[in-house]
Amino acid sequence: MPYTTTAKPLGSSVTYQVSPNIKRYALRDVGFIETKQGNFQLQRPLDPTPQMKTGLVLKVTISKDLKQLKMSIVGQNGMKAMDIFKDESERADMIRQKYQFYMNTLLQRECLQIVD
């Protein structure tokens, strides 16, 4: 998946972009790890509870120039993008709540912003 100026997970109605106020230390504070190439990568499990092993992972990667990003929710193998927004079960609702928690943290710390 190439880097783009805006990104959204499969099925999401909200599009995000890198905030112009982004700081490298803020990325590290929220859990981003700097890769060998200099990019910043965040991987967070979306399991609602430790006992539920859904295997879904939120992946956000920001380019080293802090201008572009990649974003996806992937399954256990880490390759196939998954849509957590189409299922209406209680379990899926808990997964969406955890996803929203992570995204709100990134918005509050000015790592990302919502595109109008």
Residue ranges and their predicted role:
Residues 16-17, 21-66, 81:
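Ser/Thr-rich, low-complexity intrinsically disordered terminal regions
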Residues 61-116:
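C-terminal basic regulatory modules in eukaryotic proteins
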